[in-house]
Regions:
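Outer-membrane beta-barrel domain signature
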Residues: 14-18, 68-70, 122-127, 176-180, ...
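Anionic group-transfer/hydrolysis microenvironments
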Residues: 97, 250, 286
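Single conserved hydrophobic/aromatic residue that forms the stacking wall/gate
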Residues: 282-291
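Outer membrane beta-barrel
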Residues: 1-4, 15-160, 183-188, 192-200, ...
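Detector for outer-membrane/organellar transmembrane beta-barrel domains
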Residues: 193-283
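Outer-membrane pore/translocation modules
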Residues: 4, 106, 116-117, 149, ...
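Outer-membrane beta-barrel translocator domains and adjoining extracellular loop/strand segments
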Residues: 5-12, 52-59, 73-76, 106-111, ...
Length: 291
């Protein structure tokens, strides 16, 4: 399976009167069944053309051409996991997994959100698409109007180095370097109600006991102390052949944010910068789409 999006921008407010066109991402995904109980899943994402050598026209430098050693995009392993199906109510998955916080992460394909871009509310304050390495237990229980799906996970926790003023904890997901820091893992739980045809109502909780322990240079946070992060989300979607309606709420709380801010501000890095508020609340009002 593959999916991607193409975007065209007409720069009417640009003094150069230039239009741009780009393919932000292209994704290849596949599942392989060893047998009826064991399944291998993988998803590889190419963003902004991937990596390689490119030539750019630098209009700000008298129209000079420059050859860059790498593009601004990336090739990322978004998912790679092995699943053991045991029972409809209890199954196990291990590997690189999607963290099911919010409405978009678990349903991030372009057909699952309105417009050409993912919702700003979620993508601004939490990672998107959020994927970490760990272990997951999942299943379904109940039947009829009392049917539920659940997920319980232990994954690599957020890295405090990536927290910032503009995006709260969105820059803190692991994967920047070759190895992920697993000193303080995160615990994730999600429950979805699916008893009514076309309706999905879900709630999720994320907890990491100490995000500073996952920092790449955690000795810089010795004066900060243990700093946990909690994120809560609730979302709902109703869909039939005439209309689609979606809504979600995200709330988060970070301990010792002012102290962490001082450390991240002092990090002389191209990757991490900025200060953050203690907590951030986002409410996405229900939206609808007629089809």
């Amino acid at each position: 399976m593959n999916y991607g999006t193409n975007r065209f921008y007409g720069g009417v407010d640009n003094s150069d009167h230039r239009n741009t066109i780009a393919i932000p991402r292209f994704v290849l995904a596949f599942d392989y069944k060893f047998n009826s109980k064991w399944i291998l899943g993988a998803e590889i994402e190419f963003e902004a053309g991937g990596v390689g050598i490119e030539t750019e026209l630098e209009n700000s430098e008298n129209g000079e051409y420059e050859t860059e050693m790498e593009k601004g995009g990336e090739v990322a392993l978004e998912q790679f996991h092995i699943t053991r199906l045991i029972h409809s109510a209890f199954n196990v998955r291990a590997g690189h997994l999607i963290v099911p916080m919010g409405l978009t992460n678990a349903h991030h394909e372009p057909i699952n959100f309105f417009g050409t871009s993912r919702p700003e509310g979620e993508t601004t304050i939490i990672p998107s698409t959020w994927h970490e390495t760990g272990l997951e237990f999942f299943g379904s229980f109940g039947k009829g109007y009392a049917r539920f799906d659940y997920q319980a996970m232990i994954v690599a926790g957020l890295n405090a180095d990536g927290f910032g003023r503009d995006n709260w904890v969105a820059g803190g997901k692991q994967g920047l370097f070759e190895q992920d820091n697993f000193t303080s893992p995160a615990y994730v739980a999600r429950l979805d109600y699916k008893g009514v045809p076309g309706l999905r109502v879900g709630a999720a909780f994320y907890y990491c006991n100490d995000v500073t322990a996952n920092a790449d240079k955690n000795y810089k946070y010795s004066s900060v102390g243990r700093s946990s992060v909690k994120i809560y989300s609730a979302d709902a979607q109703y869909k039939n052949k005439y209309v689609t309606a979606r809504g979600n709420i995200i709330y988060g709380d970070l301990e010792n944010s002012s102290k962490i801010s001082k450390v991240t501000l002092s990090n002389n890095s191209n990757y991490y910068h900025g200060a953050m508020p203690v907590s951030y609340t986002h409410l996405t009002l229900p939206t609808t789409e007629r089809v």
